[in-house]
Curated annotation (Swiss-Prot):
Protein name: 4-hydroxy-tetrahydrodipicolinate synthase
The family this protein is said to belong to: Belongs to the DapA family.
Natural source organism: Leptospira biflexa serovar Patoc (strain Patoc 1 / ATCC 23582 / Paris)
NCBIfam families: dapA (TIGR00674)
Enzyme Commission number(s) from the entry: 4.3.3.7
Encoding gene (name): dapA
Pathway: Amino-acid biosynthesis; L-lysine biosynthesis via DAP pathway; (S)-tetrahydrodipicolinate from L-aspartate: step 3/4
Subcellular location: Cytoplasm
Length: 294
């Protein structure tokens, strides 16, 4: 159901408001580049800083622009189950193809609490649900045993795994049904995750280099590992440098360097710090662009 590259798309801002002109151009580039789908209102999209109205509008406009050409997996997670349900119902009504639901953050629920949270969301969703496990941001880890229980729900179809723990991911794959999809939540682990049975990646770097990310994953899935590895190692410095500061600070800076949007973020996120690390990142991405990587 979920396979390939899904771009965790940034949310451009201009003078404090969502810059839809830039956003639509980014979406069109994603469509042209052949990604499987886009994921608006996720971590990379600065969803915690969006108002409820902005969140709903951004998803609506994404569906309208994409118009069935690629999938839209809408981020509707919250640390309030009630709010997550409301956002999920709204996104489903707008015609998304799937839901991305993150671990409840700050509350620190137990495994049973997360099981009940995600079950409640899945019960109201008319679209497939992709769980999102990112303990580095949420301070709770959705364990393989809990994922296995959740995978029995007919609407829970996949997980975006961002623990960075291949052993844990292997347990998830081995304990869940074969039609339950695991996607990497870390660009730099894309090929390792594919090698243990993952189906793709929810990517940050594909905002900037969508075609290269698509080619890397497509070649691997077609069995051309060597060609896939060549692209992977070309992109690896970008995968690493895209996290020299908290995501999405570096990737939004890089998108502004390439002219896609302004480098405006919403507090408490701030622009990429000037210095050696940012200059190195800038040099890397422009060198790849000069080499024809897109």
């Amino acid at each position: 159901m979920f396979q390939g590259v899904y771009t965790a798309v940034i949310t451009p801002f201009r003078q404090g408001k969502i810059d839809y002109d830039s956003y639509f151009k980014i979406l069109e580039n994603q469509i042209r580049s052949g990604v499987a789908g886009v994921v608006p209102c996720g971590t990379t999209g600065e969803s915690p800083t969006l108002s409820y109205e902005e969140h709903k509008e951004l998803i609506q406009k994404t569906v309208q622009v994409v118009s069935g050409k690629i999938q839209v997996i809408a981020g509707t997670g919250s640390n309030s189950t009630k709010e997550a349900i409301e956002l999920t119902e709204s996104a489903c009504a707008d015609g998304v193809d799937g839901i991305l639901s993150v671990n409840p953050y700050y509350n620190k629920p137990t495994q049973e609490g997360m099981f009940q949270h995600f079950t409640a969301i899945a019960n109201v969703s008319s679209k497939p649900v992709m769980l999102y496990n990112i303990p580095g941001r949420t301070n709770v880890n959705l364990l393989p045993e809990t994922v296995s229980r959740l995978a029995a729900h007919p609407k829970i179809a996949a997980i975006k795994e961002a623990t960075g723990d291949l052993g844990q991911m292997a347990k998830v794959i081995s304990q869940c049904p074969t039609n339950f999809d695991l996607l990497s939540g870390d660009d730099n682990l894309t090929l390792p995750v594919l090698s243990i049975g993952g189906k793709g990646v929810v990517s940050v770097v594909s905002n900037l280099f969508p075609r290269a990310c698509v080619d890397m994953v497509s070649l691997y899935l077609r069995g051309d590992l060597e060609a896939s590895k060549k692209i992977y190692y070309k992109l690896l410095p970008v995968f690493v440098n895209a996290f020299i500061e908290t995501n999405p600070i570096p990737i939004k800076a890089a998108m502004s360097w390439f002219g896609y949007c302004s480098n405006e973020l919403r507090l408490p996120m701030t622009s990429l710090s000037e210095g050696t690390a940012s200059e190195s990142f800038k040099k890397i991405v422009f060198q790849l662009k000069e080499e024809g990587i897109v």
